Amino acid sequence: MGILNKIFGTYSERELRRVNPIVNKIEALDEKMQSLKDEDFKLKTEEFKSRLEKGEKLDDILPEAFALVREASHRTIGLKHYREQLIGGVVLHQGRIGEMKTGEGKTLVATLPAYVNALTGKGVHIVTVNDYLAKRDRDLMAPVYEFLGLKVGVILHNLNNEERQEAYGSDITYGTNSEFGFDYLRDNMVVYKEERVQRKLNFSIVDEVDSILIDEARTPLIISGQGEKSTEFYKVADYFTKSLIAEKDFTIDEKANSAMLTDEGVNKAENFFKVDNYADAENMEIQHHVVQALKANYVMKKDKDYMIKDGEILIVDEFTGRAMEGRRYSDGLHQAIEAKEGVRVERESKTLATITYQNYFRMYNKLSGMTGTAQTEENEFREIYGLDVIVIPTHEPIARIDNADVVYKSEKGKFKAIVDEIVERYKKGQPMLVGTVSIEKSEMLSSMLKKKGVPHQVLNAKYHEKEAEIISHAGEYGMVTIATNMAGRGTDIKLTKEAEEAGGLMIIGTERHESRRIDNQLRGRSGRQGDPGESRFFVSLEDDLMRIFGSERIQGIVDKLGLAEDEAIESKMVSSAIESAQKKVEGNNFDIRKTLLQYDDVINKQREIIYKQRSEVLEGEDLKDQIRDMIRDVAYTAVNSHVSGVEEEFETELQNLVNYLEDICLPKALVKVKDISNLSDEEIKEKLLEAVENIYSNKEKEIGEEQIREIERVILLRVVDTKWMDHIDDMDHLKQGIGLRAYRQQDPVQAYQFEGSEMFEEMIYNIKVDTVRYLFHVEVEKAPEREKVAKETSTNYDEDSVKKQPIKKENRIGRNDMCPCGSGKKYKNCCGRMA
């Protein structure tokens, strides 16, 4: 590969050769654009729009349009795109990912493709990771767009419906990934089409694309309503779990981030909860609470995974170190942590709507993204999103010196060395940014520096509000900043002259992250636009990455060398062992995300069908034929499922059939068994259908055609929403247990696809039954009103981006279990058919 790259250049270099002629054309138009009067810019926009209407393509007008934006930017905000930024703009317009280093002006680059694609009138979404950046970028760039005659909006967390509609109606809309995703879900929960806020998803430019499409790919967006479960059981399970002894009663699997009972622990559980067989399906509720209590007590760490503020448990995001207000772990884990910490236990919630970022962003006609670090995940971008990564050259060569890692035997020795390094560099006034992996480590390092008399600022989840301000001072002379992970991402660190002379920004990594990309992001904070700078990572064999995934070979070498606690080794072999541990974890995480996507694709197809049906109802389409089809389907299916063809049971079956239909759509005693006992199955179907259709026609005359059509819409919406919400829970329940199929030599994904589609078909049939039942029983006293079947109480995000697992609902009768009515048939062939 290396030799081929030397001869032909890397993939990015080859692709950039194709982009260069376009950029040459843009630069050649510079003089022409400078000669335009200010009022000509809006006229040029109108001219481009009319050329597109006459059949020209975006690529035909691109050089002139880019040159126009470049000049508009220069006149309004004093910034002129340089060549590398024009290259970045072309790459984004082509629906690719541009890897642009920190400080290369990604915010300005986005104006080029955003303007060109907004000319179609279909809207452009520019996506950032938090509200602060969305508003900042909109405010910075709005003068450019408005000078060109385009309208620009921003979606913020606290906007009402009207404000959202206005923002989405703009040519270009800034906002966060979670707001865009939640608005899509809410639009598919409205009961009147006028309440929708989004237009069709057209073109999206995702800033920090790796953070949104990879780090958060495992996170579904979830809109929740109030659940029904009691909270007492969490306290009981917590009390039981605290009585257990590690290794003897339970084991912890750090790689899987889980804990499980041993045989001895199971015996204790059976005695404590007074059950005969802990593993029995009827004890699922107990198992669920114990598993979550184990995880809360022995896997989840305070001040690393979560923190307590004003008697509330707040999740700490592992990627940014931020506390996530208003966000909760699902599946009862949050309640288990509340019980562990002795704060008030809130009720579990019920999922009303959910989608993953992977499936949300794949709905755009065209998708592109920018980040400082994408190349390490190039395969994933290509395989899952169909996006390739092009490395954009930097405007100035990178002058940062990246030193080799130093490895210590113990964490104590490592932190002592870090403090010594900080003290040494502080003396000469060099600014430092120290990256830590948790609040706990930040605070430990902070107290060590206080003892040494080194003034410093700390940036972690507890000081989230001051984030941008703190990080903007990090490049000043003698400034020491301790930050959890990637806090402050999106804010440039500018050096003062004295700081530059002192060697520029020194980056100190206190631990290797499991992803090389996160390490590269930390490094990339230094050396922006050719600034001087330096970086080094300090590693110990007690760090999580080395302990869980590192090789025993390194431990062997350290033991042979007989290293003291505060002695370090620097060697190529150690660095490559660290990198291979990281690659191992990255590969593992990619596989997990790929598998999750296979699962999510099943419910995604189902979601599309349901949302399409809802949309047709909202658009006011006449449902008359659809309702007639439902009536026929319910009547015919009832005959097929009740009449077996066994002569001795024929009379009984017909009586059951009549009883069943009387419950749904037949008035009592209208059809008697003796009226149909001499007919064939087909004749029975026709007779019943005729009776039911006549009743519905009379109802239509009685209520009035216009009114019955609206009643049909109201009822169908309500039934679809109720069934869909239960189905989301059922599918999640199926997914939780599907992994065990591997023990039966079954492919879990295939089993999930097969059973999930069976469950979906069943749900569709149940929608028909309930819709028909409600329509035949409806009594109209006043005009029907549409209302939501469940009220949204929360989402799993605040205005920042973080991760969360789906929600699960327990104790449903399995489709293949025996029916509880005592018929001796399987549930799916008996009452489950009509449930």
Swiss-Prot record:
Keywords: ATP-binding, Cell membrane, Cytoplasm, Membrane, Metal-binding, Nucleotide-binding, Protein transport, Translocase, Translocation, Transport, Zinc. Its EC number is 7.4.2.8. May bind 1 zinc ion per subunit. GO terms for molecular function: ATP binding; metal ion binding; protein-exporting ATPase activity. GO terms for biological process: intracellular protein transmembrane transport; protein import; protein targeting; protein transport by the Sec complex. Zn(2+) binds at residues 819, 821, 830-831. NCBIfam families: PRK09200.1 (NF006630), PRK12904.1 (NF009538), secA (TIGR00963). This is Protein translocase subunit SecA. It comes from Clostridium botulinum (strain Loch Maree / Type A3). The lineage of its organism: Bacteria, Bacillati, Bacillota, Clostridia, Eubacteriales. The gene is secA.
